[in-house]
Amino acid sequence: MNFGKAAIFGVVLFCLLWTEGAQAGLTFLSPADMQKIAERQSQNKLRHGNMNRRGVEDDLAGEEIGVTFPLDMKMTQEQFQKQRAAVQDFLYSSLLSLGSVQDTEDKNENPQSQ
């Protein structure tokens, strides 16, 4: 029984060490072979005319586009007061809708208390 536990432990340990070894060595090619593969891949990219993302990002990062335009609005004092009241009513009603239903009903029943 003791031998069986040791055997199982040994097999598990061997499997764990084997997977770490496989993860550590990505490829068994020599550096010269890896350079050949890299050259082939770069030639394929150039042949198809694809531009890598870094090259595109560098080109766009240098450009800065800015457009300015005036936002002038002319209105009378009366028009301004109407617009101001409309915006205040809109904001007040939207804020009330966020409140509880009972608070909203109380405000609607007694408009003079505001």
From Swiss-Prot:
Source organism, top-level taxon: Eukaryota
Single GO molecular function: hormone activity
Main location: secreted
PTM summary: O-octanoylated by GOAT/MBOAT4. O-octanoylation or O-decanoylation is essential for activity. The O-decanoylated form ghrelin-27-C10 differs in the length of the carbon backbone of the carboxylic acid bound to Thr-27. 33% of frog ghrelin is O-decanoylated.
Leader sequence residues: 1-24
Keywords assigned by UniProt, alphabetized: Cleavage on pair of basic residues, Hormone, Lipoprotein, Secreted, Signal
Propiece residues: 55-114
Tissue expression remark: High levels in stomach. Moderate levels in small intestine, pancreas and testis. Low levels in heart, lung and gall bladder.
Covalent lipidation (O-decanoyl threonine), chain numbering: 27
Lipid addition sites, O-octanoyl threonine: 27
Cell compartments where the protein resides: Secreted
GO cellular component, one term: extracellular region
Function: Ligand for growth hormone secretagogue receptor type 1 (GHSR). Induces the release of growth hormone from the pituitary. Has an appetite-stimulating effect, induces adiposity and stimulates gastric acid secretion. Involved in growth regulation.
Family: Belongs to the motilin family.
Protein name: Ghrelin
UniProt source species: Aquarana catesbeiana
Chain's gene name: GHRL
